Amino acid sequence: MNPILLRLFVPVLAGVLLGLVFAFRGFLRALPAAPDCPSFVRLLAGLVGASPVTKLFYAAILAFVAATPGVEGVPRFAKADVFFVAGNVMGLMALAQGLVAAARMPKMLAFRGPSGKPGAIPVSLMIQGFFETPAIFAMVGGIIALQMTN
């Protein structure tokens, strides 16, 4: 397969699959409470439910790892490809999160708060769903690109 097509196809496919994970976000958050819950499910639930600050922390760790010298026998460009894919996947996850929120918007607007008054979802939350993670990983991607070229 053409490497350029592969670079486009893999993140999109992974993003779609992980977008489905976002659709079951509440289900994933409930899973870690089970005593027999596997550790990888706990990790996945933690990543999916992470706040913007936590995602930024993860991104900083990834940038630090990417900036370190390559392991013997593993060229640095291989690490660059991994982070290229990871950045795209996380961006698509955020997009999927925003789309799921948009699809549920009419139902969300109809809910009533504890005081009995109708609730509403602010537009800022929708914007955050679409742009939060891609922005974080675009920034980290820039750091990685600088490290690769220096």
Language model region names:
Residues 1-150:
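Hydrophobic, small-residue-rich transmembrane alpha-helices and their short perimembrane loops
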